C-alpha cells in the first residue's frame, strides 16, 4: 500500500517484500488522489485494511460476521483519522441457476476460509479435503457438487427478487456499508453475461441501466 501511494503520487519508488520487489519504479500517469481498497478474509487482513487503505471490499463474508468486520474496519480507520469506504460483494441468488453458480464460487473459497467460518457452517476437515481434491481433478463444476446447499445462504443474498432487494438494503443500512458490488463472472462467460447480470440486478431494484 505504501509503495502504491508513492507510485500514484508520481514518485520514484523502491520496494521490497517477501514475494516481490522493484527499484526506481515510476508511473508517468500517476494520480495522487487514487483510492486504494484492499480485500481479503480474516482479522489480520481487515486490520491491515483499516489501518492502511482507503477502503475495504468484504467479499463472500459469512453474513453473521459482517457487523464485526465493519466495526473493526471503522475503528481502525477512525484511529488513523481517515475517510473509509466499505464495499460488500456477494451473489444475488434468485434462481436455481444462480444457486449452482454460487456453489461453484464457494467451492474455491470455502476450503481456505478461517476455521471459525467452517465451524459456523458445520464444514469438516473431510469436506475440505474432498472439495480440494475435486477442484484439482475437475475444477469448480466438479467441486460444486460437494458444496452443500444449506451452506450457501450464509454467504449470499437468497430468495425472491423482492426479498433479496429488501435484505440487501436493510443489511447495508444496519451495518453501515457504503457500496454493494456484484461479483465478477468467469472470463469464459463473456461480456454479454456480465451485461445480463447488471440488467437483471437493476430490474430487482427497479432501476434503469444502459449496458
Outline where the language-model segments fall.
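Active-site-adjacent structural elements that line small-molecule/cofactor binding pockets in enzymes
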Residues: 1-211
Amino acid at each position: 500500500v505504501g509503495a502504491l501511494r508513492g507510485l500514484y503520487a508520481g514518485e520514484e519508488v523502491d520496494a521490497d517484500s517477501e514475494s516481490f520487489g522493484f527499484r526506481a519504479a515510476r508511473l508517468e500517469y500517476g494520480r495522487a488522489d487514487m483510492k486504494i481498497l484492499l480485500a481479503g478474509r480474516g482479522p489480520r487482513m481487515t486490520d491491515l485494511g483499516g489501518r492502511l487503505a482507503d477502503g475495504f471490499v468484504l467479499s463472500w463474508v459469512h453474513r453473521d460476521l459482517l457487523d464485526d468486520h465493519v466495526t473493526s474496519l471503522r475503528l481502525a480507520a477512525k484511529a488513523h483519522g481517515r475517510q473509509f469506504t466499505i464495499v460488500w460483494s456477494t451473489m444475488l441468488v434468485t434462481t436455481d441457476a444462480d444457486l449452482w453458480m454460487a456453489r461453484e464460487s464457494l467451492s474455491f473459497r470455502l476450503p481456505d476460509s478461517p476455521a471459525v467460518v467452517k465451524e459456523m457452517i458445520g464444514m469438516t476437515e473431510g469436506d475440505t479435503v474432498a472439495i480440494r481434491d475435486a477442484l484439482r481433478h475437475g475444477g469448480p463444476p466438479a467441486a460444486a457438487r460437494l458444496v452443500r446447499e444449506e451452506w450457501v445462504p450464509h454467504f449470499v443474498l437468497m430468495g425472491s427478487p423482492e426479498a433479496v432487494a429488501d435484505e440487501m438494503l436493510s443489511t447495508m443500512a444496519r451495518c453501515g456499508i457504503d457500496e454493494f458490488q456484484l461479483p465478477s463472472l468467469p472470463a469464459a462467460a463473456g461480456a454479454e453475461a456480465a451485461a445480463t447480470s447488471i440488467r437483471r440486478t437493476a430490474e430487482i431494484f427497479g432501476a434503469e441501466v444502459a449496458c
